[in-house]
């Protein structure tokens, strides 16, 4: 009975969420697009000509936002013809519906086969921006969840270290709680500039936050 009440309450909040309504109106697959939008507007992350990699991209709202932003950077005639000023690669183990001008690779980005596909798209270019809205399945057990969250962030950090330009940036989703300070410390070891971000589109009740790292300390 309690679970049913929780589901009904969540559904009511979801239906009446202004960001959900806005996403439906503007064609985004999820309200998460507005989290990236707010952070991008604050930190000027996405710029014409960039190479962007979206980790854990499905269902694709972050890639949609990045695509729309890079489309704005095209000259007027080029926009009519389609295309974007830049490259976006979306990676996920789950399937994802196609997005115009976005290269989607399905698979685990730790595996060689997936990395070879990524390298084929990049054609020797390094990455300007890595974005990750990945989150593990949470159990409700604080210690176990902290380890899972840290592991996901570690994966994004390792990917960024291997693929980012020296002046590149990494944006990842994280959660406040046990283990958060350790994740921030890892960012500080890897990046010269580290900043937490809590966009308004993140629900007030959620411990969700984002960590932005810029300028690698030890580029490869």
Curated annotation (Swiss-Prot):
Q: Which domain of life is it from?
A: Bacteria
Subcellular location per the Swiss-Prot or TrEMBL entry: Cytoplasm
**Can you state which reaction this protein catalyses?**
uridine(2552) in 23S rRNA + S-adenosyl-L-methionine = 2'-O-methyluridine(2552) in 23S rRNA + S-adenosyl-L-homocysteine + H(+)
Q: In the UniProt record, what gene is named as encoding this protein?
A: rlmE
Q: Which UniProt keywords apply?
A: Cytoplasm, Methyltransferase, rRNA processing, S-adenosyl-L-methionine, Transferase
Task: Please give the Gene Ontology molecular function terms for this protein.
Answer: rRNA (uridine-2'-O-)-methyltransferase activity
| Keyword Secreted applies | no
As recorded in UniProt, its EC number(s) are: 2.1.1.166
Cellular component (GO) terms are: cytoplasm
Protein name as annotated: Ribosomal RNA large subunit methyltransferase E
SUPFAM superfamilies, per database record: S-adenosyl-L-methionine-dependent methyltransferases (SSF53335)
Q: Where does S-adenosyl-L-methionine bind?
A: 60, 62, 92, 108, 133
């Amino acid at each position: 009975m309690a679970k049913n009440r929780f589901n009904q309450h969540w559904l009511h909040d979801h239906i009446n969420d202004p960001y959900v309504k806005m996403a439906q109106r503007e064609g985004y697959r999820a309200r998460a697009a507005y989290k990236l939008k707010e952070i991008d507007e604050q930190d000027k992350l996405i710029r014409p000509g960039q190479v962007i990699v979206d980790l854990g991209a499905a269902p694709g709202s972050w890639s949609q936002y990045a695509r729309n932003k890079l489309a704005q950077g095209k000259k007027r005639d080029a926009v009519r013809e389609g295309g974007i000023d830049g490259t976006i690669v979306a990676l996920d183990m789950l399937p994802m519906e196609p997005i115009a001008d976005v290269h989607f690779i399905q698979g685990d980005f730790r595996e060689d086969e997936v990395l070879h596909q990524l390298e084929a798209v990049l054609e020797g270019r390094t990455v300007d921006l890595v974005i990750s809205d990945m989150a593990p399945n949470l159990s409700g057990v604080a210690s176990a969840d902290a380890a899972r969250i840290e592991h996901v962030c570690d994966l994004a950090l390792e990917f960024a270290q291997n693929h980012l330009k020296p002046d590149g940036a990494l944006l990842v989703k994280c959660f406040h709680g046990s283990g958060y300070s350790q994740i921030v410390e890892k960012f500080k070891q890897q990046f010269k500039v580290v900043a937490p971000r809590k966009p308004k589109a993140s629900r007030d009740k959620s411990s969700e936050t984002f960590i932005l790292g810029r300028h690698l300390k030890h580029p490869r």
